[in-house]
């Protein structure tokens, strides 16, 4: 038995309520279960109950065993003086408030319908199952599934946004620096995200600004600092780039880092050198990107409207040697979608949270709804159960639902699990 199950039993009133009695035999009528408290203190606040015709308003605390009241030292905590009811699975002790008065106890172990317990056991069954509630997913009302998707999509965006805000704070609340570093981290994918971030951190964005965002200097700095202009690895056509890098590295006193690039078992388009080239082509236009992000009427297409990146003669040789680019960096559809999903939308959300402006968050949600879904094993699993997955908003939500709830069996926190437990009761 877990406490989160008892929380759900209380919140949805899934226990037997007719002629309800407390552990001491007193009559109990529940008028309001109260509001879940996500901070310290009792589990539910502003509950309203009637005990032996006397109305009480206050807090409700929930434990598996009554003795946990003492394990958590609630008897000496003033915050629990307001508790009017102790809801437990098993009453193994009497409990008292700070002032010495007894706390009424509702014991649930003999008050739960058998069908509710069987459904709970099915959800918590340790047998391997892709989704614990898969046997009844077909019966979930569409409005409930939609509501859960909207909730977890917001949770996913906000979680990513808070990571960006941590970086923003470490960068002295510099949005442009944070934009640049987050872009690099995103382009590195999971396999090279950290080396890409370290690369960006080793060349502050103010250096590019002082160089007027010059195309050749941006490429030389990033490729050289990444270790891709070493003498033994470049041809004669790229010596000019190395010379430029060495001059700029000395001028700005850049510290060299041995970046641990992972190169094995990855697709050519994900090779570190290719990802650094993409980063350089975007840093070259970074001021425009950042300005577009904060414009009210900006659309995702605005960021990729410039067409293929056209290299200068100095860069042509290098690009020619780094297949599959062969002289140009194009905005491939999957790259556009990936940047909108994993970079632009979370960054918009971060700005919205920091400025307390929901318009940015709404824009992020709209952009995700305008992008195609990304196919993966999780989205294929959900579609096998009959759920449509046509946009990135849906695929991101279903990924979050699976990884954040299904895998960790957070069924009691999920509206699908609570529907399963409560149906017909």
Language-model regions, residue ranges each:
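Low-complexity, highly charged intrinsically disordered N-terminal segments
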Residues: 1-8
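N-terminal ordered "arm"
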Residues: 8-67, 80
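Catalytic micro-motifs at enzyme active sites that drive phosphoryl/nucleotidyl and oxygen chemistry
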Residues: 33-38, 46-51, 68-76, 91-97, ...
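Aromatic- and glycine-enriched beta-alpha-beta binding-site module
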Residues: 56-94
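Compact, glycine/acidic-enriched structural inserts
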Residues: 83, 87-145
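Intrinsically disordered, low-complexity linker/loop segments enriched in Gly/Pro
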Residues: 127-170
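Hydrophobic, aromatic-lined core segments that form the binding pocket/scaffold
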Residues: 152-397, 410
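Cysteine-cluster motifs in flexible loop/terminal segments that predominantly coordinate metals
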Residues: 396-425
């Amino acid at each position: 038995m877990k406490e989160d199950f008892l929380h759900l039993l209380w919140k949805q009133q899934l226990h037997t309520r007719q002629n309800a009695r407390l552990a001491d035999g007193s009559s109990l009528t529940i008028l309001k279960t109260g509001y879940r408290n996500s901070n310290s203190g009792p589990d539910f606040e502003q509950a309203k109950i009637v005990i032996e015709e006397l109305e009480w308003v206050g807090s409700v605390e929930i434990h598996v065993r009554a003795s946990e009241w003492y394990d958590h030292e609630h008897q000496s905590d003033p915050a629990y003086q307001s508790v009017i009811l102790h809801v437990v699975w098993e009453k193994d002790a009497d409990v008292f408030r700070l002032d010495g008065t007894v706390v009424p106890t509702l014991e649930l172990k003999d008050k739960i319908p058998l069908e509710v317990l069987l459904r709970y056991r099915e959800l918590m069954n340790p047998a391997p199952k892709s989704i614990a509630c898969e046997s009844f997913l077909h019966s979930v009302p569409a409005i409930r599934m939609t509501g859960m998707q909207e909730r977890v999509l917001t949770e996913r965006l906000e979680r990513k946004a808070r990571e960006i805000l941590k970086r923003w704070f470490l960068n002295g609340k510099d949005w442009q620096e944070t934009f640049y570093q987050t872009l690099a981290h995103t382009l590195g994918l999971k396999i090279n995200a950290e080396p890409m971030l370290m690369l960006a951190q080793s060349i502050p964005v103010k250096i590019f600004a002082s160089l007027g965002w010059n195309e050749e200097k941006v490429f030389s700095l990033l490729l050289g600092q990444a270790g891709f202009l070493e003498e033994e690895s470049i041809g004669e056509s790229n010596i000019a780039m190395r010379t430029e890098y060495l001059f700029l590295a000395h001028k700005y006193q850049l510290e060299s880092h041995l970046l641990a690039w992972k190169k094995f078992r990855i697709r050519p388009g994900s090779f570190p050198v290719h990802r650094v080239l993409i980063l350089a082509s975007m840093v070259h236009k970074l001021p425009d990107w950042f300005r577009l992000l904060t414009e009210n009427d900006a659309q995702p297409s605005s960021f990729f409207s410039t067409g293929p990146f056209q290299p200068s003669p100095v860069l042509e040789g290098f690009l020619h040697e780094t297949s599959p680019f062969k002289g140009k960096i194009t905005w491939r559809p999957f790259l556009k979608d990936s940047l909108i999903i994993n970079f632009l939308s979370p960054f918009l959300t971060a700005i919205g949270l920091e400025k307390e402006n929901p318009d940015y968050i709404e824009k992020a949600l709209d952009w995700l709804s305008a992008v195609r879904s990304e196919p993966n094993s999780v989205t294929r699993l959900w579609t096998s159960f009959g759920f449509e997955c046509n946009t990135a908003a849906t695929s991101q939500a279903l990924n979050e639902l699976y990884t954040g709830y299904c895998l960790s069996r957070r069924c009691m926190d999920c509206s699908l699990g609570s529907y399963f437990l409560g149906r017909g009761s």
